[in-house]
Amino acid sequence: VMSILKEYGVHATFFHIGYTITQENADILKRQITEGHAIANHSLSHNFNLLYPGRVPNQSQIVSEVNQTMANFQAVLGKDFKTRIFRYPGGHMSWQGLESTDQALAKEGVQWIDWNMLCGDAEPASVRPTTSESMMAYLDGSQKYFPESHVKVVLMHDTAGKELTVQTLPQIIEYFKDQGYTFGVLE
């Protein structure tokens, strides 16, 4: 993914799950920063049963996981590293009753962000795109949910099993460039 982004001269924000942040992947994290990408927080566990037991947000668990993930970042990247951006696992829009958690995170200097477009790579297998063409159609169709938004935040994943996302990334970049968009990071 980073090689494609570099080839096209664009930057992205990478949301990391805290338990994966180790010295073994320090080179990847450092490369992301060196190449101008942003690194952000996506919880420690990504475990819905811990974060939202019974579909109810567990504020103390969420805040604790955000803080532990920050500690993991700092253990790898240095004590001066700080990210202010957090993406709720499953997305903020998927859960009710997050207002007090949002306020608690804000007191920690953390702001949540959601996406307003997606390529479909995290959807259930029955509707997940299986070709670059279907992924592009899915992406294009997702615009209808926030048609007035001038800023597009696209949900994509670069984990194992997401080869189609990597394969389609050049087309996705060109899609937005053709519409006059510029690329930036969330900070």
Explain the meaning of each model-derived region.
Residues 2-13, 75, 148-187:
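Terminal accessory/targeting
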Residues 36, 83, 110, 149-153:
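Structural motif
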Residues 1-88, 175:
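Active-site beta->alpha N-cap acidic-glycine motif
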Residues 15-19, 42-45, 86-91, 115-120, ...:
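Active-site-proximal beta-strand/loop segments in catalytic clefts of secreted hydrolases
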Residues 46-78, 92-150, 164-167:
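Alpha-helical scaffold elements lining the catalytic groove of polysaccharide deacetylases
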Residues 30-33, 102-107, 171-174:
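Short, surface-exposed basic-aromatic patches at helix termini and helix-loop junctions that form
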